Amino acid sequence: MRLFSIPPPTLLAGFLAVLIGYASSAAIIWQAAIVAGATTAQISGWMTALGLAMGVSTLALTLWYRVPVLTAWSTPGAALLVTGLQGLTLNEAIGVFIVTNALIVLCGITGLFARLMRIIPHSLAAAMLAGILLRFGLQAFASLDGQFTLCGSMLLVWLATRAVAPRYAVIAAMIIGIVIVMAQGDVVTNDVVFNPVLPTYITPDFSFAHSLSVALPLFLVTMASQNAPGIAAMKAAGYSAPVSPLIVFTGLLALVFSPFGVYSVGIAAITAAICQSPEAHPDKDQRWLAAAVAGIFYLLAGLFGSAITGMMAALPVSWIQMLAGLALLSTIGGSLYQALHNERERDAAVVAFLVTASGLTLVGIGSAFWGLIAGGVCYVVLNLIAHRNRY
């Protein structure tokens, strides 16, 4: 793989996947680390370890299977830790991470997760993905309210470029956005410090009570709200890779990195959609290059973990929101088409889409899981009724 021979839109897709992933949830991980009692240096080490783990796993799986397999930390898992780690010591938090990732490895080895994913109808997987991505599309247009000049210009340039050179539309929008942000003086780089920080080994402290109260919920949230949508997104995009090896590999890697602050590494859904879209590459079989580029950017982000928070603060939120929405627009449209074009499965797909898009959280598990469950129940019930009426 030669970077100089990779088309610019493919390079941009890989970069955007990492940028949006960090921009959307790095602050949540920072909060969780603070709650656990980590120092600033230890938090920087956590970000370094997470970046390296995601970079290694993304590159290894993508290059091995030649499909765009993007990994990511679990954002719902990080949100759970913000409350779940309260009252725990840092050593106990590391023990929770190790137990969680050991459970993920066990789940992958038994093949239970793979068997469950095989029975999910394609329309429901697409509906769930559309529901996950909907908020990014809505945020993009909502950002016009506060930053009309910036976001309106990005939208107009994207639309004009889309008409004549579709593959370069997102690049053009990004460039005009940067120009306007620089002209307005909205980039603040005072807090960006590019000093590589090595991860610090933290001795784990295991507790049966914490394993039940924190590790088990974190395991369930990671599998239901991260790995399940990630595998379903791959399926919806038309890619197939053996599920169990993906889960085992990411779980083992996270297990190795757990003492350094890696609480999970799962299969990405939202950011992976950028690398799996036609904008990344017109040839479906070449889109793995975008994921490989993302893996390289993950490694770079890991090497400069101390700069991540400062970099996120330097960019206007509206610029990131508009860019994310434009990058995911075709994926949202394609997912909706795949979800709704089969009339017999349409009602179940609509239920899955709406429940997922609602942001519903029950027992600490996010709406993506419940969207699949609700859509699946509708699918089974409606098919049983149709079968009974037929005979």
Task: Set out the residue ranges of the language-model regions.
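Predominant activation on well-ordered alpha-helical scaffold segments within soluble catalytic domains
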Residues: 29-33, 57, 78-82, 138, ...
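Helix-loop-helix hairpins and the membrane-proximal interhelical loops
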Residues: 1-44, 171-244, 391
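Membrane-embedded alpha-helical modules
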Residues: 86-192, 293-391
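Short coil/loop linkers at secondary-structure junctions
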Residues: 38-39, 113, 167, 239-240, ...
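Residue-level signal for transmembrane alpha-helical positions in Major Facilitator Superfamily
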Residues: 23-24, 149, 225, 267, ...
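Short polybasic/polar patches that bind polyanions
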Residues: 34, 118, 235, 258, ...
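Helix-loop-helix junctions within the multi-pass membrane cores of secondary transporters/permeases
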Residues: 2-4, 10-29, 48-129, 241-329
